[in-house]
């Protein structure tokens, strides 16, 4: 086999680096001649409804495409992957609708195209995505439906189950579109841009969840785009080039060289350095964390689309665009499919030949050559392809009758046919027959097993048991130290193929939770995009004492082993709890604890969603239900008969191994017993303070979503459901305690940015007057303290626990047991007593003359604690109360008053003392 002559690599450094850059106006070439068909298709005929129905009926019953092209009923991908090609249009004969309805299958080991089936409707310039043994066909033009000679874009979604060869119509997209593109990531399918039937270029982005058959609208592309290349790399989706609109002259369009990056977890867009020249109707794949851009089109001197033959490699980290090699024939509007180290380039349009092309080429990354493969049965452009992986491991393929591109001259002695198929053809035929028999036998056994379980009754229970056994086995594999091999070495490990478990764990769980699940509502706040750098937290400022800084590798690994998007399990302590019927007691105030993280098991996000209820007279914790999303180091407040949860870390979102702060606001209404997502804060926050003052909710300070400490303050308007910026603190800080007392908002201690070698722990006190909107200094604390908690009890401010810097040179945080009180007469902070367990990042709640201290981190034990304590203010005693079900830190708690006040505060304190006193 001849080798492709490897050309010299020419590296063009794009301005900038791997950092995100601000938007800048880039010179683009305006033109109104951006038809990807190069104007060859002048007009399409309009069909009557009867003609459309007859055409669809003939195609549905079709058993062959044309003489000489064999049809197959099975993919036959037991040992090697195959490529499916869907639809497209032949520019020479655009009214042959069978071309746009056909599905062809390509077997690389045989180098042969076969007719497979037909689609439910003809499509061209559509997009496909493969997920969980199903191929989804999204949108595209329907040649059967034309208006004024133009094909109409569609919003349909068709699903092909490749094993059974059955089509099914799924939920439509929100927008009809063609010339769009899709990518599959994290069990979701994302659709970007496109063009509608009116010729308008779209910026809309939608996300499809196959298991739920549901579409969600996401943040739009900063500019309308069609004909862009799409690829995902390390959790970020790249939208490369395309055709955009001119804002001043909407009917005209531009070729764009911009690269937009979309972060699905945060629903945000960023910019990367641009391409060296405008490019549209290209294709992109990801290999070795680099993005390969295949062909495309730019503008000629006459202002017409001109196909290009360049294959370039974009390195997102270095910001370089490296020319790798060239196609023999320049092309655009082609389709690509990647299987392992091979990339197949199918069909497309060529301005050189001024027509659609039937070429199929394969790029072999290991040998760095491009090989010609068998031609498509018909020349097609606007085609979409999907790579179907092999069902079982087997010897990887080699294109048998490959002809290298003309730029790669054949070497003497090269053979056009693979040795595997030239030697012993009888053995090959026997192997093919044996594979078919074995495949049908496995299907028969599987069907028989399912029927047997259904006949036994309670099939759901047995299925759940089987699923639990599989998950337990994978967890044991993970704990035993297994690490996945690289993809090309791990293909044969069928036992470790990720499993897809939809809706696991079931929500709501087996406990009768009164909480209702909330769908994530994507908001599109107006934010200026630009460079963002994540600032990791120093060890001297980490409340978790560095125990979670290096968990990202294991976290991602366990998700891969389990095959789950979220590693979550039902808490083991659920069986010990009786489900609470209501969150509010009739006569006694109760304490509600939300979220948190177990430092021993940070990957279990069920802990971060849990809500506990503590009844003081029963001295008992009860499991109440789940929050909509897991949170830790968030803030909570009781406001207008509802529980408000703001900000906090989301364990599912990590950057550089650290959890990322959020800006969400979740509200639980006591009357309706429902969770609702309200308006997001203007700034993402964790380790912040949330309190109510003069019937206004305030969020103060914290750490934002790029790791910086913030000084901003926000207030929430309940009527307009919006957050408003207040006067900022004099300096940024996080981990401070906050109370409302004496007409001021008091901020006690906390951490500030590390600008010197001095420890960042603060001892100062700030007081904010919301009426006159100014900050004043209060009396400093007795010692510098961070991650403490404060409460007002008996009309005094009490500061409980916290962390102070160590006395050695490292200045690491050390938990302190002190309980300090502010004496307003002497204006001094005095230590009143000490806790039995030093702790910081705990929850402190005042209940009449009682202070409850629960959870937190104990630096002396280097772990979170489940021990809880009660400080009786009236008699200055500390009692031990019922422990938390698990050691948690980063919780947030509120006190829920009773429905009707029955006891006086003195009586309630006496009853509590009688309950907890031995």
Curated annotation (Swiss-Prot):
Sperm. Gene3D superfamilies: Kelch-type beta propeller. PROSITE patterns: IQ (PS50096). Keywords: Kelch repeat, Repeat. Residues 430-459 form the IQ domain. It comes from the Eukaryota. Pfam families: Beta-prop_ATRN-LZTR1, Kelch_KLHDC2_KLHL20_DRC7. Coiled coil: none annotated. SMART domains: Kelch. PANTHER family: KELCH-LIKE PROTEIN 32 (PTHR45632:SF3), LD33804P (PTHR45632). This is Alpha-scruin. The lineage of its organism: Eukaryota, Metazoa, Ecdysozoa, Arthropoda, Chelicerata.
């Amino acid at each position: 086999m001849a080798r492709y002559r490897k050309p010299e690599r020419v590296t063009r450094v794009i301005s900038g680096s791997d950092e995100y850059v601000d938007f800048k106006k880039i010179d683009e070439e305006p033109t109104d001649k951006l038809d990807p068909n190069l104007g060859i298709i002048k007009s399409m005929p309009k069909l009557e409804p009867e003609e459309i129905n007859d055409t669809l009926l003939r195609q549905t019953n079709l058993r062959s495409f044309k003489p000489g092209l064999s049809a197959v009923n099975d993919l036959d991908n037991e040992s090697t992957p195959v490529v499916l090609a869907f639809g497209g249009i032949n520019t020479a004969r655009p009214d042959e609708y069978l071309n746009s309805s056909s599905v062809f299958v390509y077997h690389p080991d045989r180098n042969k195209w076969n007719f497979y089936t037909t689609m439910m409707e003809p499509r061209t310039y559509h997009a496909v995505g493969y997920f969980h043994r199903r191929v989804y066909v999204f949108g595209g033009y329907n040649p059967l439906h034309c208006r004024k000679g133009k094909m109409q874009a569609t919003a349909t979604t068709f699903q092909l189950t490749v094993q059974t060869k059955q089509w099914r119509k799924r939920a439509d997209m929100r927008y009809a579109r063609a010339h769009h593109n899709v990518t599959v990531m994290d069990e979701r399918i994302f659709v970007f841009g496109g063009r509608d039937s009116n010729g308008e270029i779209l910026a809309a982005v939608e996300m499809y969840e196959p298991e739920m058959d549901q579409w969600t609208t996401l943040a739009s592309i900063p500019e309308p785009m069609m004909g862009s290349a799409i690829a995902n790399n390390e959790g970020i989706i790249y939208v490369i080039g395309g055709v955009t609109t001119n804002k001043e002259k909407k009917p005209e369009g531009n070729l764009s060289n911009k690269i937009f990056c979309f972060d699905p977890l945060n629903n945000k867009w960023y910019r990367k350095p641009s391409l060296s020249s405008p490019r549209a109707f290209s294709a992109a794949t990801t290999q070795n964390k680099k993005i390969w851009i295949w062909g495309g089109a730019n503008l000629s001197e006459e202002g017409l689309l001109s196909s290009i033959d360049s294959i370039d490699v974009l390195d997102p980290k270095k910001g370089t665009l490296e020319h790798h090699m060239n196609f023999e024939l320049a092309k655009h509007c082609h389709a690509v499919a990647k299987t392992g180290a091979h990339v197949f380039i199918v069909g497309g349009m060529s301005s050189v030949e001024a027509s659609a092309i039937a070429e199929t080429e394969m790029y072999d990354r290991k040998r760095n050559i491009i090989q010609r493969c068998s031609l498509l049965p018909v020349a097609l452009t606007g085609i979409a392809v999907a790579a179907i992986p092999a069902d079982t491991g087997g010897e990887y393929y080699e294109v048998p009758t490959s002809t290298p591109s003309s730029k790669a001259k054949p070497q003497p002695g090269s053979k056009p046919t693979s040795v595997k198929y030239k030697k012993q053809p009888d053995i090959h035929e026997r192997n093919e027959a044996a594979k078919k028999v074995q495949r049908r036998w496995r299907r028969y056994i599987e069907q028989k097993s399912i029927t047997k379980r259904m006949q036994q009754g309670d099939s759901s229970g047995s299925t759940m048991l089987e699923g639990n056994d599989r998950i337990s086995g994978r967890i044991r594999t993970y704990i035993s130290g297994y690490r996945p091999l690289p993809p090309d070495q791990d293909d044969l490990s069928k036992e470790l193929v990720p499993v897809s478990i939809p809706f696991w764990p079931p929500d709501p769980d087996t406990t009768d939770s009164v909480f209702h699940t909330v769908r994530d509502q994507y908001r599109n706040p107006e934010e200026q995009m630009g460079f963002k750098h994540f600032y990791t937290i120093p060890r001297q400022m980490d409340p978790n004492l560095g125990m979670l800084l290096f968990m990202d590798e294991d976290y991602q690994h366990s998700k891969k082993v389990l095959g789950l998007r979220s590693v979550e399990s039902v808490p083991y302590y659920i069986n010990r709890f009786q489900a609470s019927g209501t969150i509010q007691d009739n006569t006694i105030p109760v304490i509600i604890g939300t979220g948190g993280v177990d430092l021993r098991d940070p990957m279990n996000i069920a802990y971060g969603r849990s809500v506990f209820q503590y009844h003081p007279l029963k001295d008992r914790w009860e499991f109440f239900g789940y929050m909509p999303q897991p949170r830790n180091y968030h803030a909570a407040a009781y406001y207008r008969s509802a529980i408000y949860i703001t900000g906090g870390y989301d364990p599912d979102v990590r950057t550089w191994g650290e959890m990322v702060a959020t800006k969400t606001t979740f509200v639980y209404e006591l009357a309706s017993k429902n969770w609702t997502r309200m308006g997001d804060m203007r700034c993402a926050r964790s380790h912040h303070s949330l309190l109510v003052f003069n019937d206004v909710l305030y969020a103060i300070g914290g750490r934002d979503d790029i790791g910086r400490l913030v000084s901003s303050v926000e207030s929430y308007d309940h009527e307009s459901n919006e957050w408003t910026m207040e006067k900022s603190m004099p300096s940024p800080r996080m981990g401070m305690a906050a109370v409302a007392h004496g007409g001021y908002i008091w901020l006690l201690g906390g951490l500030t940015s590390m600008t010197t070698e001095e420890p960042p722990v603060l001892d100062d006190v700030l007081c904010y007057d919301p009426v006159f909107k100014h900050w004043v200094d209060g009396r400093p604390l007795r010692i510098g303290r961070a991650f403490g908690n404060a409460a007002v009890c008996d009309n005094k401010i009490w500061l409980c626990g916290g962390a102070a810097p160590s006395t050695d040179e490292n200045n690491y945080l050390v938990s302190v047991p002190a309980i300090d009180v502010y004496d307003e007469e002497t204006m001094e902070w005095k230590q009143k007593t000490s806790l039995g367990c030093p702790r910081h990042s705990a929850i402190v709640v005042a209940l009449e003359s009682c202070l409850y201290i629960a959870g937190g981190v104990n630096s002396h034990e280097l772990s979170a604690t489940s021990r809880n304590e009660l400080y009786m203010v009236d008699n200055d005693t500390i009692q031990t109360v019922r422990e938390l079900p698990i050691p948690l830190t980063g919780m947030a708690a509120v006190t829920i008053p009773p429905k009707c006040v029955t006891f006086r505060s003195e009586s309630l304190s006496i009853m509590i003392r009688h309950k907890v006193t031995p």
